[in-house]
């Protein structure tokens, strides 16, 4: 059986990314710059010669758009199985979804949680802090958030493994990929910088 590898791609740069708004469950399309970056990624993956047997993304428009571009550049549109999984969506920022990120991450969160830098917070503290400041009641507490992210990626990995293993493309989101990295390796305690169009490779084995 081939090794099971997930190639985790953060979606391309969007309108909200460009103007600095918090983009969780809210959604905006890729900009022209974002599309170009993902096309370059697709070309790079094609030139690498890596074979991909399945594709997955969250159900957000920006990840679906990103995957469409990558598959087009790989010549795999409609050629390999592709499905959405809402469990690998971005974090929900509740009443701050769509607000300016600076207001949330450099203003409200540091003030409420009494820290100078939100990136120094642990993942659980940041998640539970969002719940505390969310007036809409939509943000997910850490246990629920981490549970659905781990469940989603494990289901994807098991699906690939049960097909005999191989490489799968997975398009997701910055904080979701960072959360998964922490859940896989607890030494990754802080928010890593996951750039638009970056690739993180995760190897899965033994169920």
Residue spans for each PLM region:
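Extended, basic/helix-rich recognition subdomains
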Residues: 145, 153-154, 165-187
């Amino acid at each position: 059986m081939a090794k099971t590898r997930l190639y985790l791609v953060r979606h391309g740069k969007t309108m909200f990314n460009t103007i600095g708004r918090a983009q969780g469950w809210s959604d905006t399309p890729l900009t022209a710059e974002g599309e170009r970056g993902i096309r370059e990624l697709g070309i790079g993956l094609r030139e690498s010669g890596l074979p991909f047997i399945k594709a997955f993304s969250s159900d957000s428009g920006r990840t679906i758009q990103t995957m469409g571009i990558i598959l087009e550049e790989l010549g795999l549109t409609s050629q390999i199985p592709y499905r959405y999984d809402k469990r690998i969506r971005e974090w929900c920022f509740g009443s701050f979804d769509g607000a300016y990120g600076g207001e949330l991450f450099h203003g409200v969160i540091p003030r409420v949680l009494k820290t100078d830098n939100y990136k120094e917070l642990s993942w659980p503290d940041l998640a539970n802090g969002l719940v505390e400041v969310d007036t809409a009641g939509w943000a997910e507490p850490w246990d629920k958030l981490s549970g659905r992210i781990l469940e989603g990626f494990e289901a994807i990995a098991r699906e690939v493994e049960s097909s005999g293993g191989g490489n799968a493309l997975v398009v997701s989101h910055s904080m979701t990929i960072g959360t998964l990295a922490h859940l896989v390796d607890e030494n990754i305690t802080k928010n890593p910088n996951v750039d638009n169009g970056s690739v993180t490779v995760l190897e899965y084995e033994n169920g």
